[in-house]
Amino acid sequence: MKVNLPAFERAGVMVVGDVMLDRYWYGPTCRISPEAPVPVVKVNTVEERPGGAANVAMNIASLGANARLVGLTGIDDAARALSKTLAEVNVKCDFVSVPTHPTITKLRVLSRNQQLIRLDFEEGFEGVDPQPLHERINQALGSIGALVLSDYAKGALTSVQTMISLARQAGVPVLIDPKGTDFERYRGATLLTPNLSEFEAVAGKCKSEDELVERGMKLIADYDLSALLVTRSEQGMTLLQPNKAPLHMPTQAQEVYDVTGAGDTVIGVLAATLAAGNTLEEACYFANAAAGVVVGKLGTSTVSPIELENAVRGRADTGFGVMTEEELRQAVASARKRGEKVVMTNGVFDILHAGHVSYLANARKLGDRLIVAVNSDASTKRLKGDSRPVNPLEQRMIVLGALESVDWVVSFEEDTPQRLIAGILPDLLVKGGDYKPEEIAGSEEVWANGGEVMVLNFEDGCSTTNIIKKIQTESEK
């Protein structure tokens, strides 16, 4: 199965928020200053990049979507540099110039890939009349599919409720990257995207995923939100929606060099994907993949369609990830030529929880490659009832494929994967639960081929059914 990128070229997004210019001075450090105990940096490279709301717009435009940027600037060199740089990447700027204030600028001095100091040049824009911003939003609502409010608490978003109201009346979703602990000002937004520390500053410290989900659902109810996405660094992302199971997505970052601007990338990709007509779950998947790319770069950065496609399909392109049966057979044949032991398991994996992750990690340790066969939606419905699955097949496979322990993911339509297993003939077939080996679908075929069959225990206290019951109970309160 292939995962296609959204039709970004059809997506229109307006970004309103705190615009700033990020300046970078680079150079070697070879001595300590005689004037003070500080390093001397011999600057040999200077870079200027759009930051804050401007970086969000850059991320949207870099995907090929139509990005419009509205914000407050001064009348100075920094504003002109921003306009020039953004125009070069097809961001349509409509700044409100405030002659009494400088454009917000942040200067970073770096040496040997280390940031030595940051200098901020700014005066807050609080007190500036927001009406020109409202007028620009109104003018664009008929031609955009999403509105992003990028809040860095610098004064551009003092009238958030008016902006949310304008967009919601026009049927345009509002995505907000929040700042501070006053979430009341974001009431009625479609989606908030706090990082974990921002979330816990409002909801309180969470000792477990269950507690995070419970407190997140309370925030959704308290502030009339449609959804909440908590970005959790190395723990990935968690999407919460009323009356839906939580969607936990593991991180896809391979190496982390700099998290500067990663939140801008996440909300930019979310908005562009939604504006292209995709679901929120799909938008989170692409945003998670993009975040994994951008943290591997230094400074505020963007993600191109090619980079995003490689991140999404990278494992499949190299013989791993979500696959068709034919692709899987070829991948297994190649693995066997390399002398690798192939392990296979199967299940619905509707709401991925810690028990699933632990079970799959243990299964992977038994061999060199792990195949996970997943029941289709129709198969799940026959097996679990009309209310299942909670998450459709493509989303279940995407999440499984993102796990480090899983090499290949494939689906099957039948009630059991017996036919699929007979075609693959893994070296080891494993199943979790209270089964006897001879009761496991495909066991006879695997044994006949000289393979092994094994039963693994699930982690106690983890159950998809219990999670669903808890969500239903909480929603009825």
Swiss-Prot record:
Record: residues binding ATP: N195, L196, S197, E198
Keyword Iron: no
GO biological process, one term: ADP-L-glycero-beta-D-manno-heptose biosynthetic process
Disulphides: none
Region (Cytidylyltransferase): 344-477
Highest taxon of source: Bacteria
Region (Ribokinase) residue spans: 1-318
Catalytic activity: D-glycero-beta-D-manno-heptose 7-phosphate + ATP = D-glycero-beta-D-manno-heptose 1,7-bisphosphate + ADP + H(+); D-glycero-beta-D-manno-heptose 1-phosphate + ATP + H(+) = ADP-D-glycero-beta-D-manno-heptose + diphosphate
Entry EC number(s): 2.7.1.167, 2.7.7.70
Statement: the UniProt record of this protein carries the keyword tRNA processing: no
Cellular-component GO terms for this entry: cytosol
PROSITE patterns: PFKB_KINASES_1
GO MF, one example: phosphotransferase activity, alcohol group as acceptor
SUPFAM superfamilies: Nucleotidylyl transferase, Ribokinase-like
Pathway: Nucleotide-sugar biosynthesis; ADP-L-glycero-beta-D-manno-heptose biosynthesis; ADP-L-glycero-beta-D-manno-heptose from D-glycero-beta-D-manno-heptose 7-phosphate: step 1/4; Nucleotide-sugar biosynthesis; ADP-L-glycero-beta-D-manno-heptose biosynthesis; ADP-L-glycero-beta-D-manno-heptose from D-glycero-beta-D-manno-heptose 7-phosphate: step 3/4
Active site: D264
UniProt cross-references to HAMAP family, sorted A to Z: HldE
Subunit text: Homodimer.
Function: Catalyzes the ADP transfer from ATP to D-glycero-beta-D-manno-heptose 1-phosphate, yielding ADP-D-glycero-beta-D-manno-heptose.
NCBIfam families, per database record: cyt_tran_rel (TIGR00125), PRK11316.1 (NF008454), rfaE_dom_I (TIGR02198), rfaE_dom_II (TIGR02199)
Family: In the N-terminal section; belongs to the carbohydrate kinase PfkB family. In the C-terminal section; belongs to the cytidylyltransferase family.
The protein, known as: Bifunctional protein HldE
Organism for this UniProt entry: Salmonella enteritidis PT4 (strain P125109)
